[in-house]
């Protein structure tokens, strides 16, 4: 867990956060580490370009903090109560409001959301600071390129949630996934190459190739994540199964489910998707519908196809070396978790 050790080292040297609740909430997800997929990707891309992955530790910590702030804000937007099997940042903040300030439930909810927004903002500044101290040009790239791409994808996700299903297109959903998920994977990959080669990602053909490989892997990862959100095990997934149905998330999985339904079935789907009070029986009906109409198999095949093509591009770009083999294993792990 070198990435998280580096993060805690950096945060330990950040003396300006003195407000107890803000520190507690901003660091809440870091106390329950994720898989650190993006720092691992960065280190492997650095090695593939002839560098030493140790050189990416600070940049990897920055990318993981960047990823974490986006999760905090995303959980507020999606009204999620669990992340990695633990209360989300705004839920943690609300509990602090009840316990320490004796707030009513309504006021505590507002307090928790405000804390999580500020906590996410704080982690974003830490991410940029950590990257800029180590690699100034990559810190600037994080601000000028990565952040707008990711935020555009997030906003498109929000906008799509207000569109009727019959006005959605697969193109819009792919665009959303490329911004919301693919951009950070691509950034991690190009940073690894840039650190190894000592040049800007724009000046490195290998950085561009591995960024495309990583972005495509991110798309496969997102498709797998969407499947886990409906068919996974809550204890392993760390979030309530079926929450995407109750939230009416506009995913490729659910759009294809909608498009495979008859008008009568669409009316029933419309009464369930986005209904926070949908019953367990209704959620199960949607799950069975997805299975029966082969949509689950379609999405699994789509993820496998994207991953296979990404690995082929990787193997065309790099000679057979241990880092290339590790990148292939890393990529395969993104989809393997749904099998």
Language-model features, listed with the residues they occupy:
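All-alpha prenyltransferase/terpene-synthase fold signal
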Residues: 1-339
